[in-house]
C-alpha cells in the first residue's frame, strides 16, 4: 500500500517565510 502525501507550502515563520535559526 502506498501513501501519497500532499504538501502545501503555506507555512510562514518569522517575517519573511524562511526558517530562522536560533530565534523563534
From Swiss-Prot:
Organism: Octopus vulgaris
Coiled coil: none
Name recorded for this polypeptide: Sperm protamine P3
Chief place of localization: nucleus
Location of this chain's protein in the cell: Nucleus; Chromosome
Keywords in alphabetical order: Chromosome, Developmental protein, Differentiation, DNA condensation, DNA-binding, Nucleosome core, Nucleus, Spermatogenesis
Tissue: Testis.
Region (Disordered): 1-24
Biological process per Gene Ontology, one example term: cell differentiation
Keyword DNA-binding: yes
Protein role: Protamines substitute for histones in the chromatin of sperm during the haploid phase of spermatogenesis. They compact sperm DNA into a highly condensed, stable and inactive complex.
Record-level Gene Ontology MF annotations: DNA binding
GO cellular component, one term: nucleus
